[in-house]
Amino acid sequence: MKKILVVDDDAMNLKMACFILDQKSYPVITAMSGEECLEVLEREQVDLILLDVEMPGMNGIATLEKIRQHKEYSSIPVMFLTADATEDTVIAAGRLGADGYIKKPYMPQDFLEQVENVL
């Protein structure tokens, strides 16, 4: 089964994503910051990263940039999971190689479909 890393600074958003992914029995690891995401990637192999954009410290765009620069995990698919759907953010995400963009709030079925399309 594919392992998914969910990164969001909001505990309720993490719980919601984990609950939905659990319905399909996906193993999930969570992180609450960009820095913690990079720490998890040093010790865990994951098949997909769901990454919030607006986080304190290293935001999602900066985190994606670091992920893409790192040889060991640069090829892991990354989808943004965020309420920040500004045109600039979408353009920056695409330029850095984001594999998708899920806008919050989302419907559970739509969320799962988009995740499964990338996996």
What annotation goes with each model-predicted range?
Residues 8, 52, 82:
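Active-site residues of response regulator receiver
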Residues 12, 32-36, 59-65:
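Acidic catalytic/metal-coordinating carboxylates
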Residues 15-23:
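Charged docking surfaces used in two-component/phosphorelay signaling
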Residues 18, 62, 85-102, 113:
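Alpha4 helix (beta4-alpha4-beta5 surface) of REC/receiver domains from two-component response regulators
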Residues 25-32, 40:
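Short hydrophobic/Thr-rich beta-strand motif most characteristic of the beta2 strand and flanking loop
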Residues 44-50:
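Active-site beta3 strand of CheY-like receiver
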Residues 55:
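Receiver (REC) domain active-site loop signature in two-component systems and cognate sites
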Residues 106-116:
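C-terminal output helix
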